[in-house]
C-alpha cells in the first residue's frame, strides 16, 4: 500500500474526539517528571442515528475500546481512573481498576493493554501519563495525536490498519507490539520489528510516524524525524518560513500592479458587475449561516441552533425551523 494521507485535521485542538465520540481525549499540562498527561473517556457505544461505517465498526471485533497489546521500552506508564471501570492486562494478568485504586503504574518493558471494562457503566474516564525518558521517540502528545488520528481514519475511511504505517507510528512513540507469546525473546523481536520495518524500511518507502494534519507542535515532530537517517528525507522545512496572515497582509502593495497590454485579463470583464455580500469569515472563523447536518443526534448541531443565534425575531426563527423540517 502507498504511504497514508490523513482524512481529517485535528492539529491545535486540546480536546480531540474520535469515532463519533466513542473516544475523547483531553490534553492537559503534565506534572513534573511526566512527559504528557491527558484525560481520556471511552464509551461502550454511540446511541441514535450514526453513519453506517461507524455503526459497523462499533458492532465489529475491531471496536475501539482500548489500544492493542504493546510495551514501552523506556517509559513507565501511569493510570488513574476518574469514573467507571478500567480493565488492564499486564503480562497476561488482567486487573479491574476503579477510582478507589488510586494511581497505578505499568513498568517499562511490561506487555500490557487497557480497555473499558464490560462492568463499566456507559463510559469510563481515566488519566494517563508517563515518565519522561528524554528520548526523541517516546510517549508524548505528538505521538498520541498521530496514533489516535491515524487509528480513527484507518478504521473508518481507509479500509483498516496498514501494518507498516502502524509500526512507523508506534516506533515514534516508544510503543512496540510484542511477538506472539510462544516466540522466544518476544519483546526483543517486537522491538526490532518495529524499528527495522517501521522506521528503517518504512522510512525509505515514505512512511512517516507523524503528520502535520494531526500534530499541534509540528516543529517538535520535524526535529524528531530529522534525528533519523531513514526519515529525515520525509521532512520539508519550508513551513518554517511561512509568514502569518498578518505579515502576509502587510506585504500587500498600496495599489494594484499594472501589466501593460496583459492588464485587461487581470480584471473583471463581465458586463454584469459582481455583487458580493459581507465576508463571513473573521479571524479564520466562519460566522455565516451554517448548513443543516444530515445527523442531528447525540447532541451534535444540525445547524438550526446556529441560525437561531444569528436571527433576531420570532418570525425569522419560525421560518428557519419550518425550512429545517422540510
UniProtKB/Swiss-Prot annotation:
Gene: patJ
Pathway terms, separated by semicolons: Mycotoxin biosynthesis; patulin biosynthesis
Name this polypeptide is given: Probable oxidoreductase patJ
EC number of this enzyme: 1.-.-.-
InterPro entries recorded: RmlC-like_jellyroll, RmlC_Cupin_sf
Region (Disordered): 287-326
Presence of the UniProt keyword Transmembrane in the record: no
Top class in the EC scheme: oxidoreductase
Amino acid at each position: 500500500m502507498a504511504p497514508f494521507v490523513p482524512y481529517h485535521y485535528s492539529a491545535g485542538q486540546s480536546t480531540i474526539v474520535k469515532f463519533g465520540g466513542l473516544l475523547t481525549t483531553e490534553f492537559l499540562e503534565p506534572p513534573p517528571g511526566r512527559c504528557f498527561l491527558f484525560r481520556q473517556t471511552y464509551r461502550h457505544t454511540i446511541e441514535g442515528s450514526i453513519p453506517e461505517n461507524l455503526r459497523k465498526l462499533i458492532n465489529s471485533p475491531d471496536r475501539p475500546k482500548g489500544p492493542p497489546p504493546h510495551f514501552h521500552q523506556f517509559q513507565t506508564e501511569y493510570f488513574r481512573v476518574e469514573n467507571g471501570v478500567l480493565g488492564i492486562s499486564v503480562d497476561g494478568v488482567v486487573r479491574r481498576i476503579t477510582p478507589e485504586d488510586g494511581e497505578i503504574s505499568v513498568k517499562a518493558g511490561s506487555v500490557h493493554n487497557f480497555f473499558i471494562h464490560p462492568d463499566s457503566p456507559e463510559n469510563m474516564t481515566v488519566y494517563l501519563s508517563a515518565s519522561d525518558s528524554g528520548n526523541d521517540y517516546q510517549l508524548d502528545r505528538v505521538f498520541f495525536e498521530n496514533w489516535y488520528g491515524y487509528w480513527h481514519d484507518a478504521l473508518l475511511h481507509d479500509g483498516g490498519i496498514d501494518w507498516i504505517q502502524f509500526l512507523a507510528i508506534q516506533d515514534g512513540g516508544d510503543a512496540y507490539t510484542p511477538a506472539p507469546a510462544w516466540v522466544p525473546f518476544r519483546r526483543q523481536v517486537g522491538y526490532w520489528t518495529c524499528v527495522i520495518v517501521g522506521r528503517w524500511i518504512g522510512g525509505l518507502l515514505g512512511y512517516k510516524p507523524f503528520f502535520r494534519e494531526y500534530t499541534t507542535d509540528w516543529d517538535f515532530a520535524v526535529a524528531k524525524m530529522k534525528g533519523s537517517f531513514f526519515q529525515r528525507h520525509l521532512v520539508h522545512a519550508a513551513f518554517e518560513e511561512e509568514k502569518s496572515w498578518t505579515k502576509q497582509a502587510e506585504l500587500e502593495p498600496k495599489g494594484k500592479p499594472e501589466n501593460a497590454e496583459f492588464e485587461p485579463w487581470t480584471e473583471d470583464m463581465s458586463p454584469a458587475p459582481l455583487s458580493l455580500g459581507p465576508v463571513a469569515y473573521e479571524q479564520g472563523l466562519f460566522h455565516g449561516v451554517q448548513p443543516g447536518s444530515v445527523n442531528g443526534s447525540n447532541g451534535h448541531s444540525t445547524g438550526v441552533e446556529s441560525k437561531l443565534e444569528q436571527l433576531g425575531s420570532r418570525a425569522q426563527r419560525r421560518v428557519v425551523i419550518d425550512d429545517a423540517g422540510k
